[in-house]
Amino acid sequence: MSDAAVPPKKASPKKAAAKKASPKKAAAKKASPKKAAARKTAAKKTAKKPAVRKPAAKKRAAPKKKPAAAKKPAAKKAPKKAVKKAPKKK
């Protein structure tokens, strides 16, 4: 019983804190959608900041990937247009 008795003592303050925090957050979101939207925008801003600092290499890699993606759809579209035009001419 000693093993079973120890974890509840450790877990109870965490569970109590989680129970206290979650109803407040849920009530705030239900009461004010503007505040919830403000939290989302703040989260987006914080997420963007590290992305701006880090990816010099990612910025270089992105332009290389985009032209390849741009060329492929153009190659796919061109034969389709030619097939459509041919019956019209006939």
From Swiss-Prot:
One of its GO terms (biological process) is nucleosome assembly. Residues 1-90 are annotated as: Disordered. Its main location: nucleus. GO terms for molecular function: DNA binding; structural constituent of chromatin. Coiled coil: none annotated. Residues 11-90 have a biased composition (Basic residues). The keyword DNA-binding applies. GO terms for cellular component: nucleosome; nucleus. Keywords: Chromosome, DNA-binding, Nucleus. It is found in: Nucleus; Chromosome. The keyword Nucleus applies. This is Histone H1.M6.2. The lineage of its organism: Eukaryota, Discoba, Euglenozoa, Kinetoplastea, Metakinetoplastina.
